[in-house]
Regions:
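Alpha-helical adaptor scaffolds
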Residues: 121-122, 155-215, 222
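Canonical tetratricopeptide repeat
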Residues: 84, 154-157, 192, 226, ...
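Alpha-helical segment of the N-proximal tetratricopeptide repeat
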Residues: 41-70, 74, 115-133, 147, ...
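Helix-start (N-cap) detector for alpha-helical repeat units in TPR-like alpha-solenoids
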Residues: 45, 79-80, 113, 149-153, ...
């Protein structure tokens, strides 16, 4: 069993050498930076953080939860996993407050954007939930992005929160082009564009971007979940069911896919 774990972790490290961190390192990486300081000295923990970030950007939060929890256990100095685990915790729970408190302590000597990242959790909503996303935090994401425009994670979530009148469409399309040219994972941007166009009533464009997302992430589950939602909103229940089933096949614990499959089957009776 120990040998199996060793092979698994060494494989993670080897794979990480061929992947860009979602938060880093463009051609300007040698200049002083204000990237969120996600990483520590444990290579395996760092790789788990990187993969956790990727799942967060792809809205695959349950997989991200497992990776951040494991990273935190391997390297107790990391604050970023605590931020995300606080986000994933239930409102007013002991876990939420524990992870928030640990994140503040561990980020105390980090750079300004790392501290701003933790500060996203400072205010609870009316239900007692600490959240890194939402309209109330948009200005903090904007400040983080302005501090370090090369940070892909910060840029992604700042742009995610932009309204149409702020220039969201142009910002998303520019980010898509930049991520592609950098060799970064651009699937999440396709997903956001799909939702942007669907929200604004351009169903043809929405379908185009959701289809592209499925094409570049065929083994993910959120890509098919998004495509399923598109078809569901357009009352094409057969294709919606097909994609929700694909999401469930790719990740049998995908709870939203299970719920939607049951709902669609009821509607199709």
């Amino acid at each position: 069993m120990k040998n199996l774990f060793y092979l698994f972790f060494t494989s993670l490290i080897a794979l990480s050498c061929n992947q860009k961190s979602p938060e880093a390192q463009t051609s300007e990486a040698e200049t002083p930076s204000l990237y969120i300081e996600w990483y520590g000295d444990n290579e395996v923990a760092n790789e788990m953080v990187t993969r956790g970030i990727e799942h967060v950007m792809n809205v695959e939060f349950d997989k991200a939860f497992v990776l951040f929890e494991a990273a935190m256990q391997l390297d107790s100095t990391l604050f970023g996993p605590h931020v995300m685990l606080a986000q994933f915790s239930n409102a007013n729970s002991e876990n939420q407050e524990f992870h928030y408190a640990r994140a503040k302590v561990l980020a105390a000597d980090k750079n300004v954007n790392s501290k701003l990242f933790v500060s996203l959790l400072d205010e609870k909503n009316e239900k007692g939930k600490r959240q890194v996303w939402g309209a109330d935090n948009h200005l903090i994401w904007k400040k983080m992005y302005e501090n370090e425009p090369r940070g892909r994670f910060m840029r992604f979530w700042y742009t995610f929160g932009m309204a149409a009148e702020e220039g969201a469409e142009d910002a998303l399309l520019k980010m898509l082009g930049d991520f592609k040219s950098e060799g970064s994972n651009y699937g999440p941007v396709l997903n956001n564009l799909g939702y942007f166009y669907m929200k604004n009533g351009n169903m043809d464009k929405a379908k185009e971007y959701f289809e592209r997302y499925c094409q570049i992430r065929p083994n993910g589950y959120n890509s098919h979940d998004s495509m399923g939602e598109y078809y569901f909103n357009n009352k094409d229940y057969e294709n919606s069911l097909l994609h929700y089933q694909m999401a469930l096949d790719n990740y049998p614990a995908a709870s939203n896919a299970k719920t939607m499959i049951a709902e669609i089957k009821t509607l199709m009776k």
